[in-house]
Amino acid sequence: MHEPSCTFTGHRAEKLPWGFDENDARCRRLKQKIYDTVDAVYDAGFHKFLCGMAEGCDLYFCEAVLLLKEANPDVVLEAAVPFAGQAARWPERERQRYEALLRRCDTVTVLQEEYSAGCMMKRNRYMVDHADILIACYDGKPGGTLNTMRYAIKQDIQILHLPLEDA
């Protein structure tokens, strides 16, 4: 029996209007929107979640799913890591956060050993190919998030769009 699953796409921290400042009110509101959406998706029968584990919105999503899992132990979280050592060049604090979150995931799928051009899109396609619904934090600009949404549309995957606040 197929277990309905949900994945996520969103911008990296450096592309967010508030950057790495997670105390910014816009960031706090987005994190709440992500949690509320994850909770609603869970209530609709989606208990498996896939996360790409990139800096920024992906980690917000991961944290929201793990928070949901505290109250709902049937939640399953898979980390879809594009390449081994994804966080090796991140700032120490973000790398520690990443590693702590990775340890709490039920499954970690590493798609390839080393970085290569296109490995992020390969990861994004893997997630869409294994999901029935996509939550997207998107600001309207070109990039990996838009490409992932376009791929999801081609695959006939439902998209729940969470717009980003500019200012």
Where are these predicted regions, by residue range?
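Acidic/glycine-enriched connector segments
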Residues: 1-166
